[in-house]
Amino acid sequence: MKDQLGFRIVLCSAVFIILTQNRALADLDSESHEVNSESVGEEQWEMVQRKGMQFTLNGQPFYVNGFNTYWMMTLAADNSTRGKVTEVFQQASAVGMTVGRTWAFNDGQWRALQKSPSVYDEEVFKALDFVLSEARKYKIRLILSLVNNWDAYGGKAQYVKWGNASGLNLTSDDDFFTNPTLRNFYQSHVRTVLNRVNTFTNITYKNDPTIFAWELMNEPRCPSDPSGDKLQSWIQEMAVFVKSLDAKHLVEIGLEGFYGPSAPARTRFNPNPYAAQVGTDFIRNNQVLGIDFASVHVYPDSWISPAVSNSFLEFTSSWMQAHVEDAEMYLGMPVLFTEFGVSAHDPGFNTSFRDMMLNTVYKMTLNSTRKGGAGAGSLVWQVFPQGAEFMDDGYAVYLTRAHTASKIISLQSKRLAIFNSLCSWRCRWGCKKKNQTALDALLSHDEL
């Protein structure tokens, strides 16, 4: 009788979650983009924290099914495209996504946030304010990245240009990591962003629970120093610097996850030999004081071969499993797979294969979630609304027309929501309750 009662409790809780999200998904199908204060609720909006190898929110585990949309600040800076930002949040929320990732930088380029060192465009900053305020309305938290490794949106190359314009004689983009002037430029930007008071909510960024985490850099690499020492020194300095300004928020590096010299036995998991030569070192980098969780990206089409094949799925599984194991054995922290996807530009691409990629990533995440492991979630690259095709890099998932992908994403959200709502820290390793069998039965279904 107790087992039956336990099953009923689990079932009723799960059904409530499912019905709530199914109604939201129906709203997505009808392309209704309206929201009001009643639909988003007014309950307390708290910071996500970390406890051991898991994220927590109000004492409960917080597993992530999320998305990337890097361009939100840029489109929010123009009233004619600002509505696309709202559409992204509405559509992501409708399939149960709770965390997004976007840029809190645009250095010296079109619609630049930072036009030159410490000189900002207030209208673009207000656009970032808007992004955060809209995210809060839809109960979505954001990982904000603070600079790019790549030239897009300025990146470390723009900082080097600024340095040379100020009279320095810099010859490599990697001077970004070592030159004191450029380090000061970066720290000034970090200080400005963290101390920004949102013009829509009147909340200082460093006090805003809408921000899930600060990301030091998108995909940092320092190929001029394969030993990894230069990048390690930069990470050590900047992680402590961010924490000195904001001890409340989580901090992560923004790594792709490549293994380096400190763990030669793990380099066999790298996608290619070059990955060990780019100056990053997954385990060593994440052992730095001030880093709260590890990030990993998953791009077999960029790293292995542009031609779609089942080897992509095999690599994805082994790559994710290796990093979950490392997070548990060596780091003692959560690992979040903050970017993954497959491009429509790849030879042999079809939407069915993209759906298989989604299922593979979600299965690996759920395998860790079931046992209370370090695999804390994933964020697909990337969610797009209709009408933003001109920003599409090939990886866009249009939720209103990719119906199978939307259902897969929604199902993952429902499964993780069951854990988030039913688990507590009294059952630390994966909800080991008497009703675990009933819970496993629910999670094994392809439809909820």
From Swiss-Prot:
Q: Indicate the secretion signal residues.
A: 1-26
- Annotated glycosylation sites: 79, 164, 169, 202, 350, 367, 435
Q: Which domain of life is it from?
A: Eukaryota
The enzyme class is: hydrolase
User: What SUPFAM superfamilies would the database entry show?
Assistant: (Trans)glycosidases
Can you name the source organism? Arabidopsis thaliana
Q: Which GO terms describe its cellular component?
A: extracellular region
Q: Which family does it belong to?
A: Belongs to the glycosyl hydrolase 5 (cellulase A) family.
Q: What is this protein called?
A: Mannan endo-1,4-beta-mannosidase 6
Gene designation: MAN6
